[in-house]
């Protein structure tokens, strides 16, 4: 059975037509919960049962409190939020702490909260219906992970935020029928030092990273999608990627809001 992914947001920042990272799988699963979630209707928000987080930076988690506030009272079960220890701990300590936001992991009651938090480990596979979601290792400025989403018909890989990472590609190369790879590139080549220190990629680094992808793991129609472009440099970043990829087999494309991917 195939799976559909709808891109609610994939930018490294905001503007009138840009939203931060939020990917909707089959109407009921979110990967990250950035500002793109705010474009969903109340009925669409109520359908979301699971959120899988890549890390705790604000542009990836900011809509979780608002989902609970908007539709928690009209749902009959908690919103299940998954993440590695550092991500879940950050939510508990810094968001749902009754200072920044009410603790919806205990509201309206500890036994029946609007939100439940669930720990996962890198390498761990979580089954949601017919979909298997595996946390992948990455290298960011804080503890983080990517995801491989296996529908049975194909696999989509999402890097989340990462810099150069051999471990990520080793894990990707263990997947099957990889049809889509969504990977970040946040900075221009002239800002490569900043990209590295902040745990991100530049165009040159991206092209080198893609050389680590083993074709044996890939679907014949593999597509590479670039996300997390900084708003004031996105077009220039894609231009650099296009030039660097002229002689490469893989031709990365810009991921846009409202794109739908099937796998």
Question: Over which residues does each language-model region extend?
Answer:
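Short helix-terminating capping/connector loops at secondary-structure junctions
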Residues: 74-77, 107-113, 216-222
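Cap/insert and terminal regions of metallo-dependent hydrolase folds
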Residues: 165-258
């Amino acid at each position: 059975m195939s799976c559909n992914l709808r891109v609610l947001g994939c930018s490294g920042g905001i503007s009138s037509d840009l939203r931060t990272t939020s990917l909707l799988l089959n109407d009921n699963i979110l990967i990250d919960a950035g500002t793109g979630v705010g474009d969903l209707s109340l009925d669409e928000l109520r359908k979301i049962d699971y959120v899988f987080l890549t890390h705790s930076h604000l542009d990836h988690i900011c809509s979780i409190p608002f989902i609970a506030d908007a539709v928690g009272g009209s749902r009959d079960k908690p919103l299940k939020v998954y993440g590695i220890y550092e991500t879940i701990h950050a939510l508990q300590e810094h968001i749902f702490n009754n200072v920044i936001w009410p603790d919806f992991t205990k509201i309206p009651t500890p036994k029946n909260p609007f939100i439940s938090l669930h720990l996962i480990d890198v390498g761990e596979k979580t089954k949601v219906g017919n979909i298997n979601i595996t946390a992948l290792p990455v290298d960011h400025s804080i503890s983080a992970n990517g995801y491989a989403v296996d529908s049975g018909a194909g696999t989509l890989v999402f890097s989340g935020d990462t810099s150069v990472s051999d471990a990520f590609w080793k894990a990707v190369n263990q997947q099957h029928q990889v049809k889509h790879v969504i990977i970040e590139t946040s900075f221009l080549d002239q800002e490569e030092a900043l990209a590295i220190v902040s745990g991100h990629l530049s165009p040159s680094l991206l092209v080198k990273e893609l050389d680590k992808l083993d074709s044996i793991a890939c679907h014949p129609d593999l597509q590479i999608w670039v996300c997390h472009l900084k708003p004031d440099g996105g077009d220039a970043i894609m231009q650099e990627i296009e030039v660097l990829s002229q002689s490469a087999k893989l031709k990365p494309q810009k991921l846009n809001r409202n794109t739908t991917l099937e796998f």
